[in-house]
A protein has these predicted regions:
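Positively charged, low-complexity terminal tracts
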Residues: 1-128
Length: 128
């Protein structure tokens, strides 16, 4: 797994194998876990993802600057939706990416969530 924080666009870019995305989806569904990312010399590379169960409402995706990790926290129902989206990306047989962006009234993301781009383990754009 590779996590890069992009200060220019204010988003985090996540690239992972299908197995790593499935592990992340499971941690999100369970509401706990700490997954490491591949180390890199770049100052914008994050060390991993921590998942926490909180009362919500919604899922908050934020960056812990001190520990250089991405934190995903939220209530069970909202985490379940995010986990399903991550699993769908892990099992999709074509390429592409998934934008997870908060907007007012979003049904599972909490206000203040960082935009997250999840890249397909199969690369580029879909072949459909």
């Amino acid at each position: 797994m590779r996590l890069v924080s992009d200060p220019r666009y204010g988003e985090v870019d996540l690239s992972a194998s299908a197995e790593e995305l499935t592990c992340l989806a499971s941690a999100v569904a369970q509401g706990e876990g700490l997954l490491s990312s591949a180390s890199s010399s770049g100052s914008n590379t994050l060390a991993g993802v921590e998942v926490k169960n909180t009362s919500g409402p919604g899922v908050l995706v934020h960056r812990d600057a001190e520990r250089q990790i991405l934190v995903i926290s939220g209530d069970s129902a909202s985490r379940t939706v995010l986990a399903e989206n991550l699993r769908a990306m892990a099992t999709a047989e074509d390429g592409g990416h998934l934008h997870i962006d908060y907007y007012p009234g979003h049904f599972y993301l909490a206000e203040g969530s960082l935009p997250l781009v999840v890249n397909s383990p199969h690369g580029g754009m879909p072949t459909r």
